Structure formats: structure tokens, C-alpha cells
UniProtKB/Swiss-Prot annotation:
It comes from Pseudomonas fluorescens (strain ATCC BAA-477 / NRRL B-23932 / Pf-5). It comes from the Bacteria. SUPFAM superfamilies: Metallo-dependent hydrolases. The record marks H218 as: Important for catalytic activity. This is Adenine deaminase. Its cofactor is Zn(2+). It catalyses: adenine + H2O + H(+) = hypoxanthine + NH4(+). GO terms for cellular component: cytosol. Pfam families: A_deaminase (PF00962). Substrate binds at D276. The keyword Metal-binding applies. The lineage of its organism: Bacteria, Pseudomonadati, Pseudomonadota, Gammaproteobacteria, Pseudomonadales. It is an enzyme of class 3 (hydrolase).
């Protein structure tokens, strides 16, 4: 079944480029940039990937991102991810990047963007993988900081298609970012947001009504609110669900408890994605395979999930 799932044409709509930084590349970039790491080798770092919640993961994620310093580093990171896409027949990807993770430690915005954008361009020309880049604001920082990031991004507006919202969800509701999202929309950007991963269904309502998002990233807690479920079904609002991430971060204790297939059968436009694959133990095919192994996903369900991902693209073919 793995090979069949791997060959299925699919899109990936929820992937953080910084979260695809594999330990081997992390060590190579640290050496290139002469950065001392707190881990002695790749295996020690892999063992550190045993987190219990979103915050523990984020602490490690930001520490790892510190090795990314030059445009070449960001190119190499993005290119390594695109090669994985090619291996897994991901024909279109809409990755997130978190400029604030880098600008806050002194890496200029254009250094980050130039490396990523040139890799995505080469990915289309050399690998045939189309893409649309999403700039994501960090929700644990202030809206004022997000506004500054949007200011930095506007001269490069052609390089990305949408803005998003990620990082620590609890205590940082979408309403905190209403004005910057209003402004981004007025500048012509589409909008998406992480909501309903650890946060309550109310955060999904806010993301829809206040941020006016086109797509919900995660959204698994919508299942707790029947009125919200009905709206998502009626309006066919896509959810970019990340099964391995959800179990690794204890949103669900075990994959057998995941609600993605129940949502699919209810008529929700759910999609399968890898989120931060270097940290969560798998890329898109591994996520599909886990649904087959632990939830008994059928080939018909896999086809529908893959088609949903192609239908839910912000960048239409």
C-alpha cells in the first residue's frame, strides 16, 4: 500500500520549510556557518525529538532554525524538501516560511526570501513541481511586529501568494491579528491561519469571521462544534490536517483516535499534510500510510483526500 500511496498525485498545503530541516542538513549547515550545536551528533539530536506538546517542539524548532544564515542555506533547505516532494509525487506545494524567526536574529528578510524563492523557481523548472509561498506571522509575537513584517514583505509581493498565522496557539487568538490580516487582504493577498489544533473551536470561528481565511490549517477541533462542522461542510472550507504532527504533539493520544476520516465521510474537505516532517517522523506519504495502518483508510478514501489537496490549492493550475 505504501508504494501505491506514494505514487498517488497529491499537493501539500501545510508544510513549514523550517520544519523540514533534517538533522543531517542541520549539522552540515552548522559546520558551514561555524555554529556550535548543543547536540554531539545526529542521533543525539534525533533523541531530542521526543516532545510532549506544541511548546516543547517549538523551543527545539527555533533552536534548530538558528543554523539558517545565508540565502544558500535557505535554498538548500527548500531544495531538499522539493526533492522529497519529487520522490513522493507531490506535484504542487504551498509551503510556509516564518520570516520573524530569522529577522529577529539579524538575518535580513531578503536573504531568507531570495534563497527560498529561487529554489521554488528551480523546483518548477527542473522537477516540474508548482508552488505558492505563504508568509506566516508568529502569533506569540505582537500584531505590531506582524505589521512590520508585512512592511518588509511588500516590496517582494510577487514572491508569495498568501499570509498565514502559526506558532503557539493557546492565548493568542486570531482576533489579535485582525488588522494586519485586513491590511494583507487589501494588498491583494489570500489568507490562511492555524486554528483548532490546541486552541478551541472558537479560534476557528474567529479565523473565518475576522481573518476571513480561505483555508483552515489543522482545524481538527472543529469536530467538537456541530454548528461549525456544518458551516465548514456547507461552505466547503478546506482543512489542512497533519496526522503525524497531531499524534506527536499529543493533540490525539494515538493515530487510531484521529478524526480525519470521520470528517472526510461527513463531507469536510480535509487534506493530508506533513507540517514539520523532520520533527514528526514523516513526509506526506508517511502520513497517508499511518492513516491506512492505524485507521484502515481505504484506497478510495486516499484518492478523495489526494483530490481534495489538489482542489484546495490557492494557486490554481
Amino acid at each position: 500500500m505504501y508504494d501505491w500511496l506514494n505514487a498517488l498525485p497529491k499537493a501539500e498545503l501545510h508544510l513549514h520549510l523550517e520544519g523540514s530541516l533534517e538533522p543531517e542538513l542541520l549539522f552540515a549547515l552548522a559546520e558551514r556557518n561555524k555554529i556550535a550545536l548543543p547536540w554531539s551528533d545526529v542521533e543525539t539530536l534525533r533523541k531530542a525529538y521526543a516532545f510532549n506538546n506544541l511548546q516543547e517542539f517549538l523551543d527545539l524548532y527555533y533552536q534548530g532554525a538558528d543554523v539558517l544564515r545565508t540565502s544558500q542555506d535557505f535554498y538548500d533547505l527548500t531544495w531538499a524538501y522539493l526533492l522529497r516532494c519529487k520522490e513522493q509525487n507531490v506535484i504542487h506545494t504551498e509551503p510556509f516560511f516564518d520570516p520573524q524567526t530569522h529577522t529577529d536574529r539579524g538575518v535580513p528578510f531578503e536573504v531568507v526570501l531570495n534563497g527560498i524563492a529561487s529554489a521554488l523557481k528551480d523546483g518548477e523548472q527542473q522537477l516540474g513541481i508548482t508552488s505558492g509561498l505563504i508568509l506566516s506571522f508568529l502569533r506569540h509575537l505582537s500584531e505590531e511586529e506582524a505589521q512590520k513584517t508585512l512592511d518588509q514583505a511588500l516590496p517582494f509581493r510577487d514572491a508569495f501568494v498568501a499570509v498565514g498565522l502559526d506558532s503557539s496557539e493557546m492565548g493568542h487568538p486570531p482576533s489579535k491579528f485582525q488588522r494586519v490580516f485586513d491590511r494583507a487582504r487589501s494588498e491583494g493577498f489570500l489568507t490562511v491561519a492555524h486554528a483548532g489544533e490546541e486552541g478551541p473551536p472558537e479560534y476557528i470561528w474567529e479565523a473565518l469571521d475576522l481573518l476571513k481565511i480561505q483555508r483552515i490549517d489543522h482545524g481538527v477541533r472543529a469536530f467538537e462544534d456541530e454548528r461549525l462542522m456544518q458551516r465548514i461542510i456547507d461552505e466547503q472550507i478546506p482543512l489542512t490536517v497533519c496526522p503525524l504532527s497531531n499524534t506527536k504533539l499529543c493533540v490525539f493520544d494515538h493515530m487510531s483516535q484521529h478524526n480525519i476520516l470521520q470528517m472526510l465521510e461527513r463531507g469536510v474537505k480535509v487534506t493530508v499534510n506533513s507540517d514539520d516532517p523532520a520533527y514528526f517522523g514523516g513526509y506526506v506519504t508517511e502520513n497517508f500510510h499511518a492513516l491506512h495502518t492505524d485507521l484502515g483508510m481505504t484506497q478510495d478514501q486516499a484518492r478523495r483526500l489526494a483530490q481534495n489537496s489538489l482542489d484546495a490549492r490557492l494557486v490554481k493550475p
